Amino acid sequence: MSPLALVSVSDKKNIIQFCKELIENFNYKILSSGGTAKHLIEAKIPVIKVADFTNSQEILGGRVKTLHPKIHGGILAKRTDEEHQIDIKANDLELIDLVVVNLYPFKKTIDQGAKWEDAIENIDIGGPSMIRSAAKNHKYVSVLVDPSQYQNFLEESKKGELKESYKAKLALEAFQHTADYDTAISNWISKERGFQSSKHIKSYPLIKSLRYGENPHQKAFWYGLSNIGWNSAKQLQGKDLSYNNLLDLESALTTVLEFGYAEKDELTTDTFASIILKHNNPCGASVSNSASQAFLNALECDSVSAFGGIVAFNSNVDSETAIQLKDIFLECVVAPSFDEKALEILKVKKNLRILKLSKDQLPKNNQTSTKSIMGGLLVQDTDDNKEKSEGWISVTNKNPSNQMNLDLNFAWKICKHVKSNAIVIAKDQKTIGIGAGQMNRVGAAKIALKAAGKLCSGAVLASDGFFPFADTVELANEYGIKAIIQPGGSLRDQESIDMCNAKGIAMIFTQKRHFLH
């Protein structure tokens, strides 16, 4: 008896050729319905219509096509079970050997901003039911859910009877397919109706296995969405991205996004930003009138730490900037665009990873961050990139000058992306000292102020958390700091305010903290 394939696909890529090969090489009969049947018939492929197979017409405007005992009985029947054999004969079931199904494009529908009713109609019911039935009975039935599986199935079939291990792998991929589909639906309903979900469910396909994790003895994998973020970035040259590269690129990019992100010639004067990052901490940052000057300014902050670092730009990288970049060892450079001449210059550094990530490849919606803990996950909103000065208050007798306000705003944005406890010293829209990841705030201040040294005179200081004591203000004064920005909120705020007033230092409270762990 000829094997029977049930074919019902939304994505019709390669389906005609696949069905032709099933018929010509393996003597399959094709069972199909709706748009798939029409598509195959138009291609002169013989098809048994589901309505004729079940002797039951589609109802409810096509909502019920394949939800029928003759379909699911044919898929779920155990070939060697005596009781099943009795039911097969009693119900005149024809066994189905292959299920080829992919689902209504729900993700595509909601990504296009579909209305609630339209999205609901694009929730597939019959498809997941057939996929799950076939996957459950994979000992006897093969299930294909993606056109990329067709060729491999044909090659395996040429070897003779399909191995159980191969069919089990297909079943795994099928259940992952339906799980991903249900995840998209549940997350969409939660978002649309503002419900707090009782379960945190996310589905990310495997992008690739990485060489190793943070250290060579750790395995690592990269999962993500195919149409957004780093997986959609175009790597123009260089070695494969590592686990650490991806972590650092993410930190560098989120920092530079504080200052806008634009294609060539779209930025206004003095908004070109460059961030140099090492081990998930900025080691230099600047905003200037060109990308090349911004990079040079950032490099001046800590040229030693920049060695082997990551550089991010919020603007096009031109040849002048490329000349500056090629003179030091870097792991990665990311920007929205690169001039052809710049790429020619950078090609001499064959191992340098160059990534082009355009503005339309950035996430459009608010994101969440996730951290693993023993037995669970911590999920929070990301610390958004829209830092505004509304709500900031001057708490001292002296107010910052216009230039100081620019520097305070700049330093505050950078400080947000430095590991806590964090202190950033800035002057003329560039960092001159950064103290990161210290267990006490004055310790971070000592590192940042010592790094900046004499350049501190007239500079500003930013702190990601409040001052528990006035010691940080006292230390800042010794180095010549003239303005401070911090969240405020300490029980001893007045001591810091009094110290600022006594030393002639301006201080701003943002009333917003930016811890980063």
UniProtKB/Swiss-Prot annotation:
Keyword Transferase listed: yes
EC number(s) recorded for this UniProt protein: 2.1.2.3, 3.5.4.10
Reaction equations catalysed: (6R)-10-formyltetrahydrofolate + 5-amino-1-(5-phospho-beta-D-ribosyl)imidazole-4-carboxamide = 5-formamido-1-(5-phospho-D-ribosyl)imidazole-4-carboxamide + (6S)-5,6,7,8-tetrahydrofolate; IMP + H2O = 5-formamido-1-(5-phospho-D-ribosyl)imidazole-4-carboxamide
CDD domains named among the record's database cross-references: IMPCH
Cross-referenced Pfam families: AICARFT_IMPCHas, MGS
Ranges of residues in domain MGS-like: 1-145
Keywords noted in UniProt: Hydrolase, Multifunctional enzyme, Purine biosynthesis, Transferase
GO cellular component, one term: cytosol
Matches recorded under PROSITE patterns: MGS (PS51855)
Description of its domains: The IMP cyclohydrolase activity resides in the N-terminal region.
Protein's recorded name: Bifunctional purine biosynthesis protein PurH
Lineage, highest ranks first: Bacteria, Bacillati, Cyanobacteriota, Cyanophyceae, Synechococcales
